[in-house]
């Protein structure tokens, strides 16, 4: 391989890594949602926390460590829906990005 090919390959690799990082940031931002006066990030941590909270109203800390009274079942349903929607969309874009590579 000549140096021009190596440089082109390195740039393409760097562009792919940068595009993956941008894609991750995009979908991490889309995981945020508001509910009951609190700000939440849909993800495994929130889903596991809400699965362990007993049924009925509970006080849970939101993203900004503000105590918020919520219905855990309702918040868990919203978080799960947001998580699945965004993860599915992220997967589609990630596969498209890998095909372009």
Regions found by a protein language model. Name each.
Residues 1-101:
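A preference for well-ordered globular domain cores
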């Amino acid at each position: 391989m000549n140096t021009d090919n190596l440089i082109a390959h390195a740039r393409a690799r760097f562009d792919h890594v940068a595009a993956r990082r941008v894609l991750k940031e995009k979908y991490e931002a889309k995981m945020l949602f508001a509910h009951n006066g609190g700000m939440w990030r849909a993800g495994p941590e929130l889903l596991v926390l809400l699965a362990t909270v007993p049924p009925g109203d509970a006080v849970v800390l939101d993203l900004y460590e503000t105590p918020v009274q919520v219905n855990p079942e309702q918040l868990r349903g919203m978080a799960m829906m947001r998580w699945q929607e965004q993860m599915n969309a992220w997967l589609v874009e990630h596969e498209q990005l890998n095909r372009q590579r």
